[in-house]
């Protein structure tokens, strides 16, 4: 059963890092697992940032991690396992959370994992079109 949007816990870091490192490897990029783990842990420990997951029967299938800063907001990671990208119960909570947090604000991005259309369609030159994303969310909620 697919869970609601939940905060990522410190014990989830290894699993999330495995997703990131595996995807990098499949794209021919070599990563340092320690560096990836340290970066994710830093983002998650700072509760001013946001780190959320969705699980299916206790297994993480999607996550978002974003940084809130005084001068800039950044979507650090947006990942949805491929077979869950058409699930409304996964996509609506993830995209709604971004709209809720960043409506009327600028949202940059670092890495959009595996071209998740719901986000990449609204991404251009390092910035997410939050208004366009909100229209998308409203459309798929119906």
For every predicted segment, state its role.
Residues 1-18:
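A short beta-loop-alpha structural element at the N-terminal edge
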Residues 21-40:
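Conserved GNAT-fold acetyl-CoA-binding loop/helix
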Residues 41-53, 74:
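A short helix-loop-beta-strand connector motif used in the catalytic cores of GNAT acetyltransferases and
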Residues 53, 59-67, 74:
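Conserved beta-strand in the GNAT
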Residues 71-83:
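Conserved acetyl-CoA binding element of GNAT-fold acetyltransferases
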Residues 86-100:
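Conserved acetyl-CoA-binding loop-helix of GNAT-fold acetyltransferases
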Residues 108-124:
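Conserved beta-strand-loop-alpha-helix junction that forms the acyl-donor binding cleft
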């Amino acid at each position: 059963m697919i869970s609601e949007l939940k905060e990522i816990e410190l014990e989830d870091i290894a699993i999330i890092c495995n997703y990131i490192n595996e995807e990098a490897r499949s794209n021919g990029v070599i990563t340092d697992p320690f560096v990836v783990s340290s970066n994710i842990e830093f983002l998650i420990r700072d509760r001013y940032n946001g780190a959320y997951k969705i699980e299916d029967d206790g297994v993480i299938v999607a996550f978002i991690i974003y940084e809130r800063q005084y001068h800039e907001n950044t979507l650090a990671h947006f990942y949805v396992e491929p077979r869950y990208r058409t699930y409304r119960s996964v996509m609506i909570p993830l995209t709604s959370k971004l709209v809720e947090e960043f409506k009327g604000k600028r949202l940059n991005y670092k890495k959009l994992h595996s071209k998740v259309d719901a986000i990449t369609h609204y991404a251009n030159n390092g910035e997410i079109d939050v208004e366009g994303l909100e229209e998308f969310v409203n459309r798929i909620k119906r």
